[in-house]
Amino acid sequence: MSWFTPELIEILISVLKAVVILLVVVTCGAFMSFGERRLLGLFQNRYGPNRVGWGGSLQLVADMIKMFFKEDWVPRFSDRAIFTLAPVIAFTSLLLSFAIVPVSPTWAVADLNIGILFFLMMAGLAVYAVLFAGWSSNNKYSLLGAMRASAQTLSYEVFLGLSLMGVVAQAGSFNMQDIVNSQEHVWNVIPQFFGFVTFAIAGVAVCHRHPFDQPEAEQELADGYHIEYSGMKFGLFFVGEYIGIVTVSALIVTLFFGGWQGPFLPPFIWFALKTAFFMVMFILIRASLPRPRYDQVMSFGWKVCLPLTLLNLLATAAVILYNAQ
């Protein structure tokens, strides 16, 4: 009896697809750091990294080698186990968040019926990594940064979840494939424009990206909750942040811009082009907006984003009830 049954072959193909997708995501997250530095250089009328390799193309490799050989230092009075666990949780939770995103009609790591809930669960798990990093470092700046990050993330995750409820109500499913298929005629960005705006803002805040990078503000907290990290532990936080940008960009495309749908080109090409556009938008936002105060960030969330998401949800419910009559 052969070991290679049709069921086993199907499982191996699914595992291979998952490995390929996740490796591509990690690679995109790593290369985005180089792309960001080049784009910021152009935006600020300077060159950016252009010495290592042709046009600076090997700068990322040089940074990886440098980071790999840096001393993996642990503070003397820190909680070593939790200090080591924090970057692993951060990297893993952000990477697994991409698992529910369908790259094409046949390519996805996991086709879950509760796909959106899985993403929100992974986003909530990432908060523990920040808290663990701040608490275990035994550093006042790390702890202050962790407290800022946890309060900001938990607050904006409320708006993140509520902004998606209109999309779920229209599609009638939490499954990402069903949501993409429901946009065959009209992308969700048109009927769910306020939901899209709120989701994009909350996505930037949850990723702790500028202008919502108060937990890592160098001028105030000296890099916040990962001030004590070095070597590959810092590298996991660093790459994890860019993986978060890739994931949020991919979710914006999937939920509001038709996912892989588009004329002429193959589905995965359309998905990649749309996702790359929003990744560039993340970078341009960093280049063009100032950093507000922390109290202004929290006030904006509860006084602007929350009413906007509730208004969008009420309007969506009213339209669905009207069409059902």
Curated annotation (Swiss-Prot):
Membrane topology annotation: Multi-pass membrane protein
Pfam families linked: NADHdh (PF00146)
PROSITE patterns, A to Z: COMPLEX1_ND1_1, COMPLEX1_ND1_2
Transmembrane portions of the chain: 11-31, 81-101, 114-134, 154-174, 186-206, 237-257, 265-285, 304-324
Keywords for this protein: Cell inner membrane, Cell membrane, Membrane, NAD, Quinone, Translocase, Transmembrane, Transmembrane helix, Ubiquinone
Enzyme Commission identifier(s): 7.1.1.-
Any GO CC annotation of this UniProt entry: plasma membrane
Compartments, as annotated in UniProt: Cell inner membrane
Family per record: Belongs to the complex I subunit 1 family.
Subunit relationships: NDH-1 is composed of 13 different subunits. Subunits NuoA, H, J, K, L, M, N constitute the membrane sector of the complex.
Function: NDH-1 shuttles electrons from NADH, via FMN and iron-sulfur (Fe-S) centers, to quinones in the respiratory chain. The immediate electron acceptor for the enzyme in this species is believed to be ubiquinone. Couples the redox reaction to proton translocation (for every two electrons transferred, four hydrogen ions are translocated across the cytoplasmic membrane), and thus conserves the redox energy in a proton gradient. This subunit may bind ubiquinone.
PANTHER family per the UniProt record, alphabetical: NADH DEHYDROGENASE SUBUNIT 1, NADH-UBIQUINONE OXIDOREDUCTASE CHAIN 1
Protein known as: NADH-quinone oxidoreductase subunit H
Organism: Yersinia enterocolitica serotype O:8 / biotype 1B (strain NCTC 13174 / 8081)
